[in-house]
């Protein structure tokens, strides 16, 4: 039985190599190939209980690498940009899938709202701060230090249009965002994201959150915890 499983894994790996074209050593090639073989098509609701071996798992808010894998397997990009790559999940996923990748972050010296970022990307993955839910640095250019929600949304809007212009015709921008509560008030940041550019929205995907404090807390009364984020897919016309 163990031999058969190894043969199946090896076959899946070879199929993955033939399909995606591996150019760099992977963290776990056979596991990734097996995931791609078994994955179901992307739908409007996704759940990733495990984040996988990609990126720095100590980086605050680092998302699951399986989300990036599913986006890349669905849209088949040849050139990916992550303008706020944080813990490097997207960089490592693209390396493992043999996809040309460019990534920047303020902590490595690039201000994505002002500095050159290249051009002609067919997929941009963008996971900005959720306003000041987590403050990522002392740098005043950090979006998490924007101050008011109005100022944050103004910077988010300016960033969105800058990134959108870097897409090739037919390219997509996937923006991962979550809502928050502040002093008892619900702030629907995901709704604000949809309002950035309604005419170019192609899909909205609800992503279940795992391993957050709301999962482990028992609430009483009428309080409803936030256990989801959304990925809004914007598509530049072909």
Give the predicted meaning of each segment.
Residues 2-238:
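Class I S-adenosyl-L-methionine-dependent methyltransferase catalytic core
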